Design a protein with these regions (language model features):
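Short cysteine clusters
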Residues: 61-64
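Immediate flanking context of iron-sulfur cluster ligation sites
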Residues: 42-59, 80-86
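Charge-rich, acidic-biased intrinsically disordered regions
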Residues: 76-86, 112-120
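Acidic, glycine/proline-rich low-complexity segments that act as flexible tails and inter-domain linkers
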Residues: 1-47, 100-120
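C-terminal structural segments of small proteins and small subunits
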Residues: 83-109
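Iron-sulfur (Fe-S) cluster-binding segments and ferredoxin-like electron-carrier domains
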Residues: 67-82, 105-108
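Amphipathic alpha-helical segments within well-ordered protein domains
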Residues: 34-35, 52, 69-73, 87
């Protein structure tokens, strides 16, 4: 089901406010981290937001997708630039799956080898 991306930020904001009441230090820490990360010196706002969108996709964060897509649009990112950033995210996720596949083969060899090793 597709989200209503115009209504979702309002709903999310209500949950964040609730979380802020329940765990104020955690939310304050997040806000400080977010503000610090947004004060880039070498990256312009558009580039930073395109990176954030790609990361939002790889971490499967709907709230991040909504916030950073809005920020990217406001920073002047085109639909084509967003699509290219998403292409990078897709490739990275595929690459991560390939790299972690090697870990499974390692684990299989270790576990299977241990099961077949003669008892001492």
């Amino acid at each position: 089901m597709m989200l209503d991306w115009n209504a979702y930020p309002v709903e999310l904001s209500a949950r964040v406010k609730e979380m802020s009441r329940l765990a104020p230090n955690a939310v304050a820490g997040f806000i400080a981290l977010d503000k610090g990360a947004n004060k880039t010196v070498h990256l312009d706002a558009k580039t930073r937001e395109l990176i954030a969108i790609a990361i939002a996709v790889t971490t499967r964060c709907d709230g991040c997708i909504g916030v950073h897509t809005d920020r990217a649009i406001n920073a002047g990112a085109t639909r084509e630039e967003v699509a290219e950033a998403l292409g990078v995210a897709i490739a990275l996720n595929a690459g991560a799956a390939l790299a972690y596949s090697a870990r499974v083969l390692d684990a299989y060899a270790a576990i299977d080898g241990a099961a077949k090793a003669p008892a001492e």
